[in-house]
């Protein structure tokens, strides 16, 4: 089970509030103390969640942090490991806004976050990322070399909308839809041959059929969220039942017998993952 992410911005907001409420004439040592205390209060709450989760279930518990820098997690990753987390998911959600920022520098920031965290812990580290990279295969290779044992494809970013009466931004599409799964399905199928680690399908996986598709593409596992809010926790059993029936119907005893069967490497029509199929779909060129 993957726990909800703790956001770096939440911690920093609490820290900044403590600093603001302190005396403007406070000594630097006091500011440092307040910063550490703010980090401690928020992080302690999350560590307790990990401990309680480990006590409640007998399956692996994966902690998750939503981070935008490497500076806040050097020591905290050790605490996450110490309280019993079986793995750590780095939910890396960078939204570049500066046109002067080199894309390579953005990639280096991601690699640095992974390197710093992995250097301090022994449990597996997975990177949860968005789909917006020029070369996903190259970025995936860089994250693997930086220490990521797995990739979660993909992070689902905030979906904004505009209220034309109040002239304000508002949230839209809080939950994913089944149609969103195609993003991860394609990348999982392409990366299956080259990544060399675990690939986790995410976003838009709402039923058992979607699970089968992800496994056929090459996924090691899938993450579920929206479908559980919409349909309840009983949806897990329904999806597993579908998977088991599908395996019996097709003569499979083990998931590894068909995992990656329709990846780009093994597909009978690998061009479905390439530009030629895009042209064919639009203009009917064979």
PLM regions: where:
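Alpha/beta enzyme core
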Residues: 3-28, 41-62, 66-202, 206-224, ...
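Short glycine/proline- and acidic residue-enriched helix-loop micro-motifs
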Residues: 29-37
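Generic anion/oxyanion-binding catalytic loop in active/binding sites
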Residues: 35, 62, 99, 228, ...
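Short leucine-rich amphipathic alpha-helical surface patches
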Residues: 219, 226, 243-247
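Helical hairpin unit composed of two closely spaced alpha helices linked by a short loop
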Residues: 223-227, 231-232
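C-terminal extensions of enzymes
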Residues: 231-250, 256-286
């Amino acid at each position: 089970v993957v726990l909800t992410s703790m956001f770096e911005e939440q911690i920093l907001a609490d820290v900044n509030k403590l600093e603001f409420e302190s005396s403007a004439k406070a000594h630097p040592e006091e500011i440092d103390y307040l910063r550490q205390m703010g980090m401690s209060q928020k992080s302690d709450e999350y560590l307790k969640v990990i401990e309680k989760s480990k006590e409640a279930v007998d399956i692996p518990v994966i902690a998750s942090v939503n981070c935008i820098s490497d500076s806040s997690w050097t020591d905290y990753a050790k605490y996450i490991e110490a309280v019993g987390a079986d793995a750590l998911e780095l939910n890396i959600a960078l939204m570049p806004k500066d046109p002067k920022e080199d894309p390579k520098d953005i990639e280096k920031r991601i690699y640095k976050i992974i390197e710093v965290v992995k250097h301090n812990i022994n449990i597996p580290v997975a990177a949860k990322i968005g789909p917006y990279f020029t070369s996903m295969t190259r970025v995936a290779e860089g994250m693997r070399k930086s220490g990521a044992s797995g990739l979660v494809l993909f992070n689902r970013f905030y979906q904004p909308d505009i209220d034309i009466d109040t002239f304000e931004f508002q949230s839209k599409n809080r939950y994913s839809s089944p149609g969103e799964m195609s993003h991860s399905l394609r990348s999982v199928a392409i990366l299956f041959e080259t990544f060399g680690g675990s690939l986790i399908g995410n976003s838009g996986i709402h039923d058992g059929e979607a699970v089968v598709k992800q496994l056929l593409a090459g996924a090691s596992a899938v993450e579920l969220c929206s479908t559980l809010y919409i349909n309840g926790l009983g949806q897990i059993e329904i999806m597993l039942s579908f998977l088991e029936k599908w395996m019996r119907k097709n003569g499979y005893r083990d998931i590894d017998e068909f995992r990656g069967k329709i990846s780009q490497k093994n597909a009978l029509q690998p061009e479905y993952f390439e530009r030629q199929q895009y042209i064919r779909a639009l203009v009917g060129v064979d």
